[in-house]
């Protein structure tokens, strides 16, 4: 397992791992974790659960050791069922397992992680093996389910959609929120992006769209780009620094959850120009704070966000600018979008996700 500081999949792992054992005291749960990728305080939370054991598995994800040494470690435990929370299951593991496939992005878009041909072949072999051998596949949206069917040739009946939730709920008190916003020198209204800075996030076009918004509509606002830089895509940060109004870009790397909650609470709206997603967790987090969403017109965003979002052409910075402007001068429309956002957020819960995942475990054992 990886920790919640490692983007959407890490969050997914931690939220399920911290909930499912509390729903099921008839079984023992063993969590394999990489010590360099899990926060000590999160390990303590899991260790304190009476039916949980923790085993260190310090193998780099997507590595040969993961396919061999981790395989040996799994076989030593004589497990009744394994849940691999991402596609990278050892291809020679032949005991019952469930796998979560969050998306098929690497089949759709090139990136540094798969640019070398042999790496891409390995990815395709591993994900195909996991999908074929799993008793059940969990995915996080109907859009991803359709992609899994299309690219892996898996029947619909084998795939179960279990929606994710948001762990950032409620509100931050005003004093704390102001302190955190002052910490990051946020003195102007701001749009907020949250996510790992991968190529698929299309951050450059988002920044260009915001740049056009400033040029065209002359509003005094910032774009806060918040999240975890990806070492495989260093060019993204370099290109962001070449934007004309780069002084209006506020870059916040890897904030703590309390800071992130305050950043959501203080934002004018959430925005993302992502090209492909499996779910879109940051937008769901934003909805919990009643933020209107201004996002790319992708199938998964339409599915998950529905009427809580304004949609733009992610390849057209001018359209991004125009859609950002829609919320500025119409307070009635802005408040209507806030209400829609809060109403939509009620359909997403980690407690429900944990319950549905446990039900799936019981079906396949």
Regions from the PLM with identified roles:
Residues 1-365:
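Carbohydrate transferase catalytic cores enriched for Leloir-type hexosyltransferases
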């Amino acid at each position: 397992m990886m920790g919640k500081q490692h983007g959407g999949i890490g969050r997914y792992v931690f939220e399920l791992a911290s909930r499912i054992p509390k729903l099921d005291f008839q079984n023992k749960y063993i969590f394999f974790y990489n010590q360099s990728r899990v926060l000590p305080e999160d390990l303590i939370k899991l260790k304190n659960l009476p039916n949980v054991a923790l085993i260190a598995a310090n193998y780099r994800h997507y590595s040969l050791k993961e396919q061999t040494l981790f395989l040996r470690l799994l076989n030593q435990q004589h497990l009744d069922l394994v849940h691999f929370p991402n596609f990278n299951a050892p291809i020679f593991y032949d005991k019952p397992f469930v796998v979560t496939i969050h998306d098929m992005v690497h089949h759709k878009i090139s990136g540094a992680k798969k640019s070398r041909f042999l790496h891409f072949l390995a990815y395709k072999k591993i994900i195909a093996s996991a999908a074929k051998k799993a008793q059940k596949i969990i995915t996080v949206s109907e859009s991803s389910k359709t992609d899994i069917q299309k690219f892996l040739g898996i029947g619909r009946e084998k795939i179960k959609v279990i929606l994710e939730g948001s762990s950032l709920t409620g509100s931050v008190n005003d004093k704390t929120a102001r302190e955190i916003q002052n910490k990051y020198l946020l003195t102007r209204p701001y749009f907020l992006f949250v996510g790992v800075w991968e190529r698929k996030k299309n951050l450059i076009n988002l920044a260009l769209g915001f740049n056009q918004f400033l040029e065209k509509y002359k509003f005094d606002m910032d774009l806060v780009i918040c999240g975890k830089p990806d070492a495989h895509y260093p060019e993204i940060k370099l290109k962001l620094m070449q934007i004309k109004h780069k002084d209006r870009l506020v870059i916040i790397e890897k904030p703590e959850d309390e800071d992130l909650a305050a950043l959501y609470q203080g934002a004018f709206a959430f925005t993302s120009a992502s090209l492909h997603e499996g779910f879109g967790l940051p937008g769901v987090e934003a909805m919990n704070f009643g933020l209107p969403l201004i996002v790319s017109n992708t199938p998964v965003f339409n599915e998950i966000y529905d009427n809580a979002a304004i949609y733009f052409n992610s390849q057209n910075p001018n359209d991004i600018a125009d859609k950002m402007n829609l919320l500025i001068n119409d307070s009635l429309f802005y408040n209507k979008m806030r209400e829609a956002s809060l109403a939509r957020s009620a359909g997403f819960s980690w407690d429900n996700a944990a319950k549905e995942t446990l039900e799936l475990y019981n079906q396949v054992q």
